[in-house]
Amino acid sequence: MSSTEPAPAPAPEPAPAPAAAPAAAAAAPKGMRKNGKNWHDVKTPFRPTKGQTSYARRLEERKAMAAIKEKEKEMKEEKEAERQRRIQAIKDRRAAKEEKERYEKMAEKMHRKRVERRKRREKRNKLLNS
């Protein structure tokens, strides 16, 4: 090689991707904060997001929310029905117990056959009235 020939230029290095540059800039702190609270996130300017979602996407989100609400409502109704069933079972047991005690009290005063006749008559009347 002679000294008069120019040296070949080094191959140009590819530039970093433009999408990676802003992310790296946001992540890297820009020196010390004035108030010294370096553990806080860097504040960004307020950008309203009002017109940024498409109408179709909003419709999809509304459908999803409606489905979720429907499922929640169904689950609440099932839970309430189970609760009412338990309450009704307790009431039925208490009523049966009171009726049994009433007949026992009656049996102390009256003859056994007379009490049984009354039981049958009351059952008939109960069936007719219900």
From Swiss-Prot:
Region of interest (Disordered), ranges: 1-55, 91-130
Pfam families for this protein: Cgr1
Superkingdom assignment: Eukaryota
Location(s) in or outside the cell: Nucleus, Nucleolus
Pro residues: compositionally biased ranges: 7-19
Keyword line: Coiled coil, Nucleus, Ribosome biogenesis, rRNA processing
Biased composition (Basic and acidic residues): 91-109
Biased composition regions of type Low complexity, renumbered to the chain: 20-29
Chain coiled-coil ranges: 58-118
UniProt feature, compositional bias: Basic residues: 110-130
Major subcellular site: nucleus
GO biological process assignments: rRNA processing
GO cellular component term of the entry, any: nucleolus
Family: Belongs to the CGR1 family.
Function according to Swiss-Prot or TrEMBL: Involved in nucleolar integrity and required for processing of the pre-rRNA for the 60S ribosome subunit.
Protein known as: rRNA-processing protein CGR1
Protein's organism: Coccidioides immitis (strain RS)
Gene that encodes it: CGR1
